[in-house]
Amino acid sequence: MSDLNDRLASYIEKVRFLEAQNRKLAADLDLLRGRWGKDTLSVRAMYEGELQEARKLVNDTNRQREELEKEIRKLLDELSEYRRKYEDALRGHQIDRDRIDELLNQLSGLEAEINLLRRRIANIIEEIARIKKENLQFANELTKARSDLDQETLNRIDFQNQVQTLLEEIDFMRRVHDQEIAELQAMASRDTTPENREYFKNELASAIRDIRAEYDQICNVNRMDMESWYKLKVQEIQTQSTRQNLEQNYAKKRLRVQLTDLRGKLADLEGRNSLLKQTQELNYQLEDDQRSYEAALNDRDAQIRKMDEECQALMMLLDTKQTLDAEIAIYRKMLEGEENRAGLRQLVEQVVKTHGLTQVDETESLRVLKGETASRTSFQRSAKGNVSIQETAPDGRYVVLENTHRSKEEAIGEWKLKRKIDGKREIVYTLPRDFILRPGKSVKIWARGQGGIHSPPEQLVFDLEDTFGSGSNVQTILFNREGEERATHIQRSSHTI
């Protein structure tokens, strides 16, 4: 940019120098009119250095233009690459969002399962508490049964002692009765009457039998009662102990099964908790990646905006350079025309003023002809979009339209090009339907019979008119389909003697 500005400043200085030279030459022209054609060779030699410098300047400008075009193409390629990467990043961002939604759904399902398992664990804990309570109750009953067993054992010992006491008492009573019987027998033996002895003996034997029978009956009854009661108590204790053992075994088995299930569920829950922690860590990492990604996108957007601004500045500079190239080309053609003629016919002075922000170009030229007439021509261009009127031939042979945008096509089908000559005559040309003007391209519209070839989209031929017209005040206006003015080109010429 600085180099181009330096070159532009140098060019402006050169133009000013040429202005001074032209003024000097204009003063010398009056002297040359009287002796026209005498000093042609000397004048040509005098301007040969100027022509060489102009050619060198044109070559340098063309070379700089090619370098700028290469740089712009490189920037456009980089911009396309950044756009592609940006689109890839957007697609990756969408995939990450879908993955986050899927993980969130899985997390919701896992949280629901965890809540369900927590409720089941609470129910199992309540069941364990109930079983422990029942076990405590069974233990209390077992303790009571053992206490009853001990009491019954003590009762049995007491009854055995009572039996022993009764047996001893029976034995004592037997001895007493035997002694009484012996005494009665002794008394009976002292009885001398055989009938009395026999009678007492029989009575005594009968009494003894009755006593023995009664004693045996009492002993049998007591023994049977004791045995039945003892067997009943033992059976009850055994039955109760067996039932308690069965219940305890069943409770133990059920607790073992529940404990195994709880251990399995606990391991499952630990695995799920580990998975949840990993998911949470992945979410945190994903959020960090998203923040980094958004920061990178913001940086990239800032770089893209900066590149767009630089690209726009370069395009504005390129437009200015193209305008200068066009003016230099005109100047070169005029100078080359001087080389091809026999004498000095005309001197040309051009001053270019470009306003890139308003998209209005003004060009003013002064033409001094042989004889007594001087012609001054000024050009003014403006555009309200990407399509502008780049050039109009002063003799009305052609009109050039250009798309200044570097990447956007412009559909200008059925647009109208109106050309007004000196406020009187008006020529209207309608562009073909569905005509597309490509980015950075131009189309030259030739009048009929002016050497143009109809080869869209580079060249078109206006078959209805032989010329677009020429005059001292020519306005060329481009309208869109809706009749809105999109671009203008104004040419004003004045002649002085």
From Swiss-Prot:
Tissue-specific expression: Giant body muscle cells.
GO aspect biological process, one term: heterochromatin formation
Region (Coil 2): 203-342
Cited SMART domains: Filament
Record region (Linker 1): 33-46
SUPFAM superfamilies in the record: Intermediate filament protein, coiled coil region, Lamin A/C globular tail domain, Methyl-accepting chemotaxis protein (MCP) signaling domain
Ranges where the record places region Linker 12: 185-202
Region ranges (Coil 1B): 47-184
Family according to the record: Belongs to the intermediate filament family.
GO molecular function annotation: structural constituent of cytoskeleton
Subunit architecture: A and B can form homopolymers.
Disulfides per UniProt: none
Protein name, entry field: Intermediate filament protein A
A GO CC term assigned to this protein in UniProt: nuclear envelope
Keyword Cytoplasm recorded: yes
Domain LTD: 375-493
UniProt keyword annotations, A-Z: Coiled coil, Cytoplasm, Intermediate filament
Region listing for Coil 1A, in residue ranges: 1-32
Tree of life domain: Eukaryota
Region (Tail): 343-497
Organism in which the protein naturally occurs: Ascaris suum
Domain annotation IF rod: ranges: 1-342
Compartment(s): Cytoplasm
